[in-house]
């Protein structure tokens, strides 16, 4: 079936056994690298090498080792604090260029990664954490973040089409991923990411619309978030 996500429409395939969903695989939006291995000068950490990538949203991807950090829960606060500086400087120095969405000229998230390794099942895997302003990080491997990382890996010849990559989060949860295809669109090398994972029901919510509600379809305001 088709799901409407913030970045667009994505294809969903569920694996069901005995009326229980075992896993769900999504075919995410086309993902691509905007800047590869660019130099970014920071006040706190000097010059670092980063890449800017689209995976359904915009990311700046950094190597956690450049900050003498490993991706584990005890370093969560440090990653969040560092990401604020990185995103602010990167948006000032780089911004973002999307071939078909000119308004998407900014970087939304900072993703820290560790080098790709080969696990005991002879599959490539890698740790990551995605920081979300003003002070959060994704406890999952992040679907859009993983899509961005796959695009970066393909650009660096670290992965082949249809090769499995296990994306591992800061708490150790995983997505099984691979690249369905690579192609050229609007002058950009792009990939189609496939991401498989599972989730668990933790609650149920019911929403109502009153016939007397003056705003039955909701309302819209401009951005009220402060700059960071």
Show which residues each predicted segment covers.
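Active-site proximal loop and beta-alpha junction motif in alpha/beta enzyme cores
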Residues: 1-228
């Amino acid at each position: 079936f088709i799901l409407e996500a913030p970045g667009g429409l994505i294809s969903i395939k569920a694996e069901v056994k005995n009326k229980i969903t075992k896993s769900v695989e999504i075919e995410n939006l086309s993902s691509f690298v905007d800047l590869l291995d660019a130099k970014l000068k920071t006040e706190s950490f000097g010059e670092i090498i980063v890449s800017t990538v689209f995976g359904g949203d915009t990311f700046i991807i950094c190597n956690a080792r450049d900050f003498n950090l490993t991706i584990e829960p005890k370093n969560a606060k440090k990653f969040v604090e560092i990401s604020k500086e990185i995103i602010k400087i990167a948006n000032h120095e780089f911004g973002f260029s999307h071939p078909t969405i000119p308004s998407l000229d900014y970087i939304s998230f900072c993703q820290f990664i560790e080098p790709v390794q080969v696990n005991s099942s002879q599959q490539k895997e890698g740790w990551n954490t995605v920081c979300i302003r003003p002070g959060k990080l994704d406890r999952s491997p992040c679907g859009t973040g993983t899509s961005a990382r796959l695009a970066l890996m393909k650009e660096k010849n670290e992965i082949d089409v249809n090769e499995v990559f296990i994306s591992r989060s800061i708490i150790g949860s995983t997505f099984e991923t691979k690249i369905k295809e690579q192609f050229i669109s609007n002058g950009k090398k792009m990939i189609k990411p496939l991401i498989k994972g599972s989730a668990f029901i933790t609650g149920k919510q019911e929403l109502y619309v009153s016939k007397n509600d003056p705003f039955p379809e909701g309302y819209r305001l401009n951005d009220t978030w402060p700059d960071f």
